[in-house]
């Protein structure tokens, strides 16, 4: 799956706690290295969207000022 595919899956989730549960599940079940990298990128992107108040950004377009709030 691509980063966009994972991001669309993660956008169905509106809380950081639920996002972490899905992230842990996928991290445990995925075996392909490229899928894992794409999933990590999408999860980080969704974390940034959630801490910015739910504002949606295109892949790779999250402002640098938002990243300081992502844990």
UniProtKB/Swiss-Prot annotation:
| Keyword annotations of the record | DNA-binding, Transcription, Transcription regulation
* KW DNA-binding (keyword) present: yes
Family matches, as Pfam families: HHA
Any GO MF annotation of the entry: DNA binding
Q: Which family does it belong to?
A: Belongs to the Hha/YmoA/Cnu family.
**What is the role of this chain?**
Binds to H-NS and modified the range of genes it silences; H-NS alonge silences core gene while the H-NS-Hha complex (and presumably also H-NS-YdgT) silences genes acquired by horizontal gene transfer. Plays a role silencing virulence factors in the absence of factors that induce pathogenicity. The complex formed with H-NS binds to the specific 26-bp cnb site in the origin of replication oriC.
Which top-rank group of organisms is this from? Bacteria
Complex formation: Forms complexes with both H-NS and StpA.
Question: What is this protein's name?
Answer: Transcription modulator YdgT
Instruction: Show the InterPro entries listed in the entry.
Output: Hemolysn_expr_modulating_HHA (IPR007985), HHA_sf (IPR036666)
Query: What is the organism field in this record?
Result: Salmonella choleraesuis (strain SC-B67)
List site positions: Interacts with H-NS. 44
């Amino acid at each position: 799956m691509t980063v966009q595919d994972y991001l669309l899956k993660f956008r169905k989730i509106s809380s950081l706690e639920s996002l972490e549960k899905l992230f842990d599940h996928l991290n445990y079940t995925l075996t392909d290295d490229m899928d894992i990298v794409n999933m990590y990128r999408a999860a980080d992107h969704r974390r940034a969207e959630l801490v910015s108040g739910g504002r949606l950004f295109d892949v790779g377009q999250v402002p640098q000022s938002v990243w300081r709030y992502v844990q």
